[in-house]
């Protein structure tokens, strides 16, 4: 299997070319994903209400909390598959796919049930504005009921990513995006279901993308065919996936809890401020997508080359990726800060929402370059099998620094000051990751296996 089938062997050839060509489909897919998320926000902000806009924004960290654990396990699968593929052990690749899907099928019902039961308690913790309570609850219940599609898509993407294939994932996302936009227009504008229509559109689109992904992989790559209900579960191999992926999943879960802690404070300032925060968050996420895509590429690149015992290529690839991430982040941050007001106006005509969004961007975007360096280095270490240190680093920066400083600054200087806490957390975490990577402490995590 070679690049003609979408699968890329990154242990030979130009590291820059491999990373770039792997990143581009991921980037296009991430833009598509954010595009349909922004269509959701545009539709509800302009044709439903600010309460619906706040509901969609509040929903993200809650849904992320429930999907993050399995997303982390999928990342572990990506690393194990990449290392096996780079070392030419295709039987191990096959076993990893079977084990991942067997675990997914066994756990999806308990995850969904837990999510549905926790919707009301989490909304209480988040201090959701009473004016937006009903719409937020509706949105969360529907999206939580459809978690299978979101988690399943991430699993398919992780499997293909380990073998250097990001172009097929773009196809899955294209299907989801087109369908989601159509359903938004149909269920909100044509059939006025409000926030319920937005939630239904999201769930149906994700479910179709996941099922289409299984069909496509089984047809295109029969040697990698997914058997959701009759795969052979390799307990020892799955434990290795868990060793690498569980810290990443725990990190994502705790970061989601940290995000909910932030939202709890944000929600205390009212519906307009919450809507503005959510608009700003969407815009900063959009500008960060290239770095996110580069980080995903470096996981697969490092994994394959560690499997092939090419540490020289690992270091070369990481240097290239960090440089690309820094250049992009500096340019995009300057652009977003410069156009913060007109960009915010796209999503809401309310002056209070626009002002809150613009202020968020003006405070959060300047130190984003620190987060870019942190993100790429942590991803590189995960690709080498060292996922515990990145977890401790990021969780400490969010839970021990960002959230406490956010409350402290907001209470002392007002709501806008809370955003300074982002830069504080990123600066400390970035410095620690640079030290850990430069010291080479991540290398033994693979060699000892």
What are these regions (language model features)?
Residues 1-23, 81-148, 190-246, 302-367, ...:
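Short alpha-helical transmembrane segments in multi-pass integral membrane proteins
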Residues 10-47, 61-76, 80, 108-112, ...:
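N-terminal transmembrane alpha-helices
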Residues 20, 24, 36, 73, ...:
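Residue-level signal for transmembrane alpha-helical positions in Major Facilitator Superfamily
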Residues 21-40, 142, 153, 176, ...:
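Transmembrane helical elements of multi-pass membrane transporters/channels
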Residues 26, 30, 42, 79, ...:
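Transmembrane alpha-helix boundary and packing residues in multipass membrane permease domains
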Residues 31, 35-53, 123-130, 186-193, ...:
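Helix-terminus/linker motif at the lipid-water interface of multi-pass membrane proteins
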Residues 53-113, 150-169, 263, 277-340, ...:
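Small-residue-rich hydrophobic transmembrane alpha-helices
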Residues 74, 142-161, 169-177, 198-211, ...:
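Short runs within selected transmembrane alpha-helices of multi-pass transporters and secretion channels
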């Amino acid at each position: 299997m070679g690049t003609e089938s979408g699968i890329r062997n990154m242990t030979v050839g130009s590291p820059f070319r491999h990373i770039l060509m792997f990143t581009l489909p991921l980037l296009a897919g991430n833009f598509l994903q954010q595009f349909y998320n922004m269509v959701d926000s545009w539709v509800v902000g302009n044709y439903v209400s600010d309460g619906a806009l706040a509901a969609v924004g509040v929903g993200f960290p809650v849904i992320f909390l429930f999907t993050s654990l399995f997303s982390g396990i999928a990342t572990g699968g990506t690393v194990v598959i990449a290392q096996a593929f780079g070392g030419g052990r295709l039987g191990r690749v096959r076993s990893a796919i079977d084990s991942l899907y067997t675990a997914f099928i066994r756990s999806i019902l308990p995850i969904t049930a837990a999510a549905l039961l926790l919707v009301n308690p989490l909304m209480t913790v988040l201090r959701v504005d009473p004016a937006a309570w009903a719409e937020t609850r509706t949105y969360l219940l529907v999206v939580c009921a459809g978690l299978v599609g979101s988690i399943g898509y991430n699993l398919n993407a992780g499997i293909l990513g380990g073998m250097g294939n990001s172009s097929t994932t773009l196809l899955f996302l294209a299907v989801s995006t087109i369908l989601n936009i159509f359903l938004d227009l149909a269920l909100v504008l044509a059939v006025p279901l409000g926030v319920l229509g937005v939630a239904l559109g999201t769930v149906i689109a994700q479910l179709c993308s996941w099922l289409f992904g299984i069909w496509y992989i089984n047809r295109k790559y029969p040697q990698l065919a997914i058997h959701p209900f009759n795969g052979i579960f390799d307990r020892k191999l799955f434990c290795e996936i868990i060793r690498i992926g569980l810290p990443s999943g725990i990190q994502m879960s705790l970061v989601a809890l940290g995000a909910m802690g932030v939202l709890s404070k944000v929600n205390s300032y009212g519906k307009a401020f919450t809507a503005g925060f959510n608009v700003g968050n969407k815009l900063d996420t959009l500008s960060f997508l290239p770095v996110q895509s580069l980080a995903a590429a470096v996981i697969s690149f490092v994994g394959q080359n560690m499997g092939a015992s090419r540490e020289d290529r690992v270091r070369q690839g990481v240097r290239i990726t960090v440089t690309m991430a820094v250049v992009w982040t500096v340019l995009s941050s300057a652009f977003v800060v410069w156009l913060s007001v007109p960009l915010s106006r796209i999503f809401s005509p309310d002056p209070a929402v626009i002002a809150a969004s613009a202020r968020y961007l003006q405070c959060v975007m300047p130190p984003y370059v620190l987060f870019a360096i942190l993100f790429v280095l942590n991803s590189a270490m995960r690709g080498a099998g060292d996922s515990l240190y990145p977890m401790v680093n990021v969780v400490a920066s969010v839970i021990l620094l960002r959230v406490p400083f956010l409350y402290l600054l907001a209470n002392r200087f007002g709501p806008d000051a809370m955003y300074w806490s982002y830069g504080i957390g990123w600066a400390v975490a970035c410095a620690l990751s640079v030290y850990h990577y430069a010291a080479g402490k991540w290398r033994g995590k693979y060699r000892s296996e």
